[in-house]
Amino acid sequence: MTTVAQAIDRIRGLAQTAARVDAELDKRHGIDPKLGMNYFDPKSIARRQETNSEDVKLAQYLNGFDIETLRRIEALMYSGRNGTPTIDERDDLRKTHPTKDDVVRTIMEKRVSFDAYFDRGLDRAKADGIDLDTF
């Protein structure tokens, strides 16, 4: 059985690999991430149509968890983002993200900020004495 801490480590690793693939795809299509994309530019259109295989792997990994484990992961992430207690985040997110698809989508949307969010969220949970696998 994978613990929440182990899952977060794996999620972070998958996200870092996905970020490298994003950079490679941007480079292949001549996109300068500092300048952003012109939505209607043919290079930007081609780039948006590319699939990041590592994003797919991350989504598959997340979908392999039950919803309660995903809620813990999501709550830790949002606690690190918002600075609110992890348990409060979990309870609030349960209302606004009622389905597993909602939870996976919102976790995926924060991929570029995982390291900072999870670092702060894990530190806060530790300071609050929260058991990551049972809260």
Predicted regions and their residues:
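Serine/threonine-rich low-complexity intrinsically disordered regions
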Residues: 3, 41, 53, 86, ...
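Residue-level signal for secondary-structure boundary elements
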Residues: 19, 23-26, 70-73, 82, ...
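Amphipathic protein-protein interaction modules
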Residues: 59-108
